[in-house]
């Protein structure tokens, strides 16, 4: 073999060896930069988990492998210690670590029975009893509505587990058809299972990740399939988190628009002013006025409202209403005369219907 070809082969072998030692690129699998925050990592996992779940890709022979890689990437990068080890030593430095079930990770975001990929509620077999659904109000701040967030909910969930012995049950009932004569049939419902393995309800701690999506609306619900009340003879109900946006001391939400009031002095209302409003994510909204601002005047800042839930690239407006703080001390006669001369404005005393048109 020529020396040049031998050198190329050695370089290729070294590259392959280095790649094998380095292992999988978890950042690339999740599609996030190495500087990604934990919120970015959770958001990326949740989005990709829906796309790559094997049940949604039955024709892809690598679907299970892709889903497992995604779960492994999330398990490492969502844990600060594992992430630090991975950043320093690569995947090889994690070989001795405990690995979680990727199905368990998925259930933290979507529930025990996964996600209904057809976009429709799970089909219910009427012959299978089902536990009650649970609806829990989840309070979120306007800051979370603006920027999005992941809320970790830890709950004690009653779960049916096997116990010694047998029990009577109604878990399986079938319709039996008996022919009574020509053209005559009788249908009866019969229990076809006389005894089942005994079960008992035990409390298990469950950690669920609820994604508060930007622009989420008050009253919207996030379902977790199979996380509701258990049923010893059937399947558990669902758990639904209902969004309840708490009142904000500065901003009021109306659709995708935000409303707020700003109080300025009488001097500022006459000669103008500059100021900044701190927005929900901390950025500053600058206001500059070089003309008279009347009490009740409104200023619209387009694109400074909340993100639209269906399209986060579209944002509403910030509507600012100005209040004027008049001096509380009485003016001297000299001051009054000075103001009259300065403004040079005559008397305007007009009486009219200010609510006309309503």
UniProtKB/Swiss-Prot annotation:
Chain positions found as Phosphothreonine: 188
Secretion signal, residue range per the UniProt entry: 1-22
Tissue specificity field: Pancreas.
Keywords associated with the record: Chaperone, Disulfide bond, Endoplasmic reticulum, Glycoprotein, Phosphoprotein, Signal
PTM notes: Contains high-mannose Endo H-sensitive carbohydrates.
Positions annotated as glycosylated: 261
Domain J, chain residue ranges per copy: 25-90
Subunit structure: Part of a large chaperone multiprotein complex comprising DNAJB11, HSP90B1, HSPA5, HYOU, PDIA2, PDIA4, PDIA6, PPIB, SDF2L1, UGGT1 and very small amounts of ERP29, but not, or at very low levels, CALR nor CANX. Binds to denatured substrates in an ATP-independent manner. Interacts via the J domain with HSPA5 in an ATP-dependent manner.
GO cellular component: endoplasmic reticulum lumen
Gene3D superfamilies registered for this protein in UniProt: DnaJ domain, Urease metallochaperone UreE, N-terminal domain
GO BP term (any one): protein maturation
Protein localization: Endoplasmic reticulum lumen
GO molecular function: unfolded protein binding
Protein name as annotated: DnaJ homolog subfamily B member 11
Superkingdom of origin: Eukaryota
UniProt function note: As a co-chaperone for HSPA5 it is required for proper folding, trafficking or degradation of proteins. Binds directly to both unfolded proteins that are substrates for ERAD and nascent unfolded peptide chains, but dissociates from the HSPA5-unfolded protein complex before folding is completed. May help recruiting HSPA5 and other chaperones to the substrate. Stimulates HSPA5 ATPase activity. It is necessary for maturation and correct trafficking of PKD1.
């Amino acid at each position: 073999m020529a020396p040049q070809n031998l050198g190329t082969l050695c370089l290729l072998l070294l590259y392959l060896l280095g790649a094998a030692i380095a292992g999988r690129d978890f950042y690339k699998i999740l599609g996030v930069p190495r500087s990604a925050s934990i919120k970015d990592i959770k958001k990326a996992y949740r989005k990709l988990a829906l796309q790559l779940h094997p049940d949604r890709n039955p024709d892809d022979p690598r679907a299970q492998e892709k889903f497992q890689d995604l779960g492994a990437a999330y398990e490492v990068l969502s844990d600060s210690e594992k992430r630090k080890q991975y950043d320093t030593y690569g995947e090889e430095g994690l070989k001795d670590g405990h690995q979680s079930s990727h199905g368990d990770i998925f259930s933290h975001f979507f529930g025990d029975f996964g996600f209904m990929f057809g976009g429709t509620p799970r089909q219910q077999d009427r012959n299978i009893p089902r536990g009650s659904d649970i609806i829990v109000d989840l309070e979120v701040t306007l800051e979370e509505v603006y920027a999005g967030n992941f809320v970790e909910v830890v709950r004690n969930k009653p779960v049916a587990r096997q116990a010694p012995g047998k029990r009577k049950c109604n878990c399986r009932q079938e319709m039996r058809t008996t022919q009574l004569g020509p053209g005559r049939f009788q249908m009866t419902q019969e229990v076809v299972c006389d005894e089942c393995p005994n079960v008992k309800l035990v409390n298990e701690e469950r950690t669920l990740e609820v994604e508060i999506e930007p622009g989420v609306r008050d009253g919207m619900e996030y379902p977790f399939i199979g996380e509701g009340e258990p049923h010893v003879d059937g399947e558990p109900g669902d758990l639904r988190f209902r969004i309840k946006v708490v009142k904000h001391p500065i901003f009021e939400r109306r659709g995708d628009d935000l409303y707020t009031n700003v109080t300025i002095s009488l001097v500022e209302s006459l000669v103008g002013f500059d100021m900044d409003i701190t927005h929900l994510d901390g950025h500053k909204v600058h206001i500059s006025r070089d003309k008279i601002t009347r009490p009740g005047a409104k200023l619209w800042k387009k694109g400074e409202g909340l993100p639209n839930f269906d399209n986060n690239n579209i944002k509403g407006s910030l509507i600012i209403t100005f209040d004027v703080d008049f001096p509380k001390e009485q003016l001297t006669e000299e001051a009054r005369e000075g103001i009259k001369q300065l403004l040079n404005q005559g008397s305007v005393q007009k009486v009219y219907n200010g609510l006309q048109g309503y």
